Structure formats: structure tokens, C-alpha cells
Amino acid sequence: MSKILYLMSNDLDSSLNYYLRNGMNPHSLYYNCTGVQQEGERRPFLGVYFMMVGLLILSIYIPCLIVISRSDLMRSSCYKIMLYLGLIDICCLVVNSLITGYLGFIGATFCSFPRFIFFAGSIGCGCWMGSCATCILLAVNRCTDINHNIPLRRIFIGKNIYFTLLIPVFYTVYSVFFTKPILFNSLYMSWFFNPFIGLESDKYVNVSHTINNCCVSLCAASLYGYLSFLIHWKNRHAQSEALSKTQKQILIQSILICTCNATAAFIYVYMQFFYSPPSVILLGQIAWQCAHASVCVVYITWNRTIRRKVKKLLIPKKWRKRNAVTSTFTVTRPIMSLMTSDLTKATWSNSGTVF
């Protein structure tokens, strides 16, 4: 117990908070590069991969968030949570995709750009922990959407959701400014708390991050297991076909998002304490990228409402009109439009969420 308290006590001196108060210089006791000879390895292929995937995901994610923020979807507490999740996901994607790709491309280590890597690592680690808390909150929200008898449902109703969102917001701020950052090393194309790989020291262990990752794995599995049970029960007893279809979409979206988060959390905890071959470390880095990218991929592939609005946002009006004129017109189109409208109304009335 005393060991854990010691590791947590030196978080402040190893954190972004100290870095900013010390004239944007990391603590010399923990992050002194004087006399350190640690050369990186240029990773041009992986560097280009991470940067290209990051740009692609951001080009999809940002329009999705714009659509969500401007649409009636924001009437749902679920989408208010998703909007905040999207904002911190973008911060993480900048770090684990664009910055990771660039640093890997040039073969950088912590001592190559200590100030820049320290700052980026603080943002990346803090926003990752914040996204974990937000995902758990989202899972609880979805459970209460389906089972209205859960007492916690009241914290998502009306203006209460704004106070509830302060929980992941404060947790994100704490994680960014008051815990140890992750630091890049091109030898493994990943981020570690220890800036000097090969010089082992337990003073770089981030206890808060470890607890966070263990909790997100256990809580996510438990909550989504419960969600699966609720959906299975609803499918057997619900009279509305539209409700059944909506619940299935919720389950698919939740599982896809949860799986990447839990995988990244588990691998990162494991490789901080046990030997991991480079392939496993790289898998963890890709899983971290996928954990934040999966949300917008789910939006654009499974959520017809968001997909339709994104097309409307990105495709010029004259192109849409030209496509509408040249497309084949059949009598089934008004019927399908009516069905979509009815499905939307049914979904709002039953779960408060359009999927």
C-alpha cells in the first residue's frame, strides 16, 4: 500500500501541471536527457500508415460531430455524451495517429523532442482515460434507456445530464494535468511511461492509468453483458418491430466500440508490467487508435440518420439535385420515406435515441 501511495505522490512532479509551472520543462529528476544516448529507428511505412489512417478517420469523425451538434439528435442525453466523447476522441487521434506517425517516420525518442513529446503524451494519456470514463457513462445511459426502472436514469433526464457530464470532464482534466504522461519511442512505435527503455525503474508507473484500464475492462464487460441481456429480453417480449431493430443496432454499436476500448486497455496495462514482444506492443498501439476511430466508423456505417446528414453536409446541393434527377424514381420511395419517419418517431418515443 505504501508503494502505491509513493507512486501516486510523485505523479504531481511528473505531470503536465509541474511541466507548465516549471517553464515548460519536465522534472529533471525523472526526465533528464543529459548524457543519455538513446537512438530511435526510422519507421517510414508505419509512420505513413498511422498518419494516413488518422487523417482518414478525422475527415469522417469531424463531420459526424458537426452533424450531431446541429441536429435534433442532441435532444437525447445519449448524443450529448457521444458529442463529448467525440471531442476527446479527436484529441487522442491527433496524438496516437498524426503525432505517432510523424515521430515514427523520423525515428524520434523522448530525448529528441522532450518538451513536445511530454506535452503530447499528457494530452494523449489524459484524454484516453477521459474517454474510458465517458464510455462507461455511455454504457450506463444505454442501460437506463432500455430499463427505465434503474434509479440512475434520473441523472440523464433534462438538465441533469449537464451536471452528470461534469464527472468525465473533471476526470479528464485530472488525468491530463495531474498524472504521468506517456512518452513516445520509435524503437517500438508506441508510447510508454518510462522515457528510457532499457533503464528499468518503477518510479514511472502510473497507478491511476492502471486502475483506469482495469476498471474499464471489467465495467465495460459487465455493463455490456447486462445490456445484451436486456436486449435479448426485449426482443422476446417487445411488441414493436421498430423497437427490436433499434435495440439490435444499439447492441452492435456498443459491442464494436467496447471491444476496441477493452482490448487497448488490457494490452497497455500488460505491456507496462510484463515483457511484451514488439508485435504485441504494436498491436496495442493499433488497438488504441482503433478504440477512438471505431466510434465514427460505427456512426457512418450503422447510423443512417448521421450518414444521411453527413452526405448533406459534404455534398454540394447542386450535386445532390443532379443525382436525384438522374436516379430512378419508383413508387416505393415515398413509402420508404414514410417508414423512415415512422421508425424515427417510434424510436424517439421508446428509447429517446435514434440509431
Task: Describe these PLM feature segments.
Residues 1-355:
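Seven-transmembrane-like multi-pass membrane architecture, highlighting hydrophobic TM helices
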